[in-house]
Amino acid sequence: MADKPNMTEITSFDKTKLRKTETQEKNPLPTKETIEQERQGESTP
């Protein structure tokens, strides 16, 4: 069955080959201050 992982590969996996990476949000959520500034900008003509 291809759905089940090969247990020998899992038990013999070398974690030292993994590298640390710095993750960065591609589309971060706006802060409350940013939302308030945008709302104030929309209300003025």
UniProtKB/Swiss-Prot annotation:
GO biological process: actin filament organization; induction of bacterial agglutination; regulation of cell migration; regulation of inflammatory response to wounding
The entry's keywords: Actin-binding, Cytoplasm, Cytoskeleton
GO MF terms, alphabetically ordered: actin monomer binding
Region (Disordered) residue spans: 1-45
Coiled-coil annotated residue ranges, if any: none
Functional summary from the UniProt entry: Plays an important role in the organization of the cytoskeleton. Binds to and sequesters actin monomers (G actin) and therefore inhibits actin polymerization.
Name the record gives this protein: Thymosin beta
